Amino acid sequence: MHTGEEMSKDFNIEIEYKHVPRLDAGSDESISYLDEHGYVVIKNALSTEEAKKTLDLLWDYLEALGTGIDRNNPNTWDDDKWPTCAHGGIMPSYGIGHSEAQWFLRGIPNVKKAFAKIWDTDELLTSFDGVSLWRPWNLNSEWKTESGQAWFHIDQHPISKPGKQCIQGLVNLLPTSEE
C-alpha cells in the first residue's frame, strides 16, 4: 500500500488528509465551500433506504446481464462473469448510465437539490457516464485497488481548471474506510 508521500512522488501531488465538513444539500454554505475548495461533501445526500434501493437496483442490473452473477454468491463475482471495468472498477459501458439504478439515483431529492443549487436552476441536464463498482477485496485480494492507481479521477480539476464547467457527483452506497 502506498503512503501519501509515495503517491506524491508518483503523481507529483501533495495529499493532505483532513476532516472535511459535511454540508446540507442546497445550502449557501455548500456552494461557498464548493467555490473555495473545488468540491463539497453533502451530508445525508441519500437516506439509508435510498442507498439500499440503489444498491439493489445495481445488483438487479448486474444479474440481468446474463453472465451468471448472483448477488448472494461471491463465487459468481469473478472476472469471467463480472463486466469489464477500467482500473478494476470503473464501468462506462453496457448501458449502465441509463440503468434504472442511475435514473433512481439522479432523481433522489437531495441529489437534485444539490445540483439545482450549484447551477441555480431546477431544469437540470445530466450526462450518462458510468459507475464505479469495486468488489470487496477482502474476499479476493486481486480485486484490491492499490493506492496510487489512477482509478479515482475527476474530469475537471478544481485547481488547474477552476469554475463550474463539469460538476460530478460521487455517492458511496456502502460504508468506506481509508483501507
What is the predicted function of each stretch?
Residues 51, 178-179:
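Intrinsically disordered, low-complexity acidic/polar segments
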Residues 157-178:
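Short, conserved beta-strand element in jelly-roll/cupin
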Residues 2-36, 43-159:
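Non-heme Fe(II)-dependent double-stranded beta-helix
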Residues 41-42, 171:
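Short hydrophobic-aromatic micro-motifs
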